Amino acid sequence: MDSKGSSQKGSRLLLLLVVSNLLLCQGVVSTPVCPNGPGNCQVSLRDLFDRAVMVSHYIHDLSSEMFNEFDKRYAQGKGFITMALNSCHTSSLPTPEDKEQAQQTHHEVLMSLILGLLRSWNDPLYHLVTEVRGMKGAPDAILSRAIEIEEENKRLLEGMEMIFGQVIPGAKETEPYPVWSGLPSLQTKDEDARYSAFYNLLHCLRRDSSKIDTYLKLLNCRIIYNNNC
């Protein structure tokens, strides 16, 4: 493994240790975070946000690394980026265009958008892991990241549902979320078309994980620190 790969792996392991230590200190690793449901949660909102921000940042880092690895190995000179622009299955969600717009968006709307994005990725992440496992010669660097992202996405969704329950007690988050229909493209026998579909999915994952990370940090600053950050 080259020095760059070792450095990236070391950084990820360090972040995992930090997250694990935080969760151990909070007593939320060996037992459920809220054993009696979000309405009776004993973990503070600040701690829930701290955990969520770190997990979302970790997911975005993994997504970026996985996309870059796939781009380097399978997409050079193929022009996949021109087909990937504006073709994400989550494009129908009315997300803020930039950080300034996000800052002007009500916190309940931002939380609903985060929940919608996370839920919309449950299915494609499951199939991404399955299809990468079956990909001939797929590097472990891509598969291992896909597995981690699928697991962390579920954890982050659970955490965001708890945060939503604390910030807006009694509210029920029932907004519909986009459904992914790209599995046939990941399974086509046309190799270029299949790689293009993988490229598009990873490009969208990197984009959406960046949005989630940005929105979560804004919410953390606004709700926990009263915008003093």
Curated annotation (Swiss-Prot):
GO MF terms held by the record: hormone activity; prolactin receptor binding
Pfam families: Hormone_1
GO biological process: biosynthetic process; blastocyst formation; cell surface receptor signaling pathway; female pregnancy; inflammatory response; lactation; long-day photoperiodism; mammary gland development
Residues modified as Phosphoserine: S56, S64, S120
SS bond partners: C34-C41, C88-C204, C221-C229
Annotated Gene3D superfamilies: 1.20.1250.10
Keyword tags: Disulfide bond, Hormone, Lactation, Phosphoprotein, Secreted, Signal
Main location: secreted
Signal peptide: 1-30
Subcellular location: Secreted
InterPro entries: 4_helix_cytokine-like_core, Somatotropin/Prolactin, Somatotropin_CS
Superkingdom classification of source: Eukaryota
A cellular-component GO term for this protein: cytosol
PANTHER family: PROLACTIN, SOMATOTROPIN,PROLACTIN
Quaternary assembly: Interacts with PRLR.
Similarity comment text for this entry: Belongs to the somatotropin/prolactin family.
Purpose: Prolactin acts primarily on the mammary gland by promoting lactation.
Protein's name according to its UniProt entry: Prolactin
Gene behind this protein: PRL
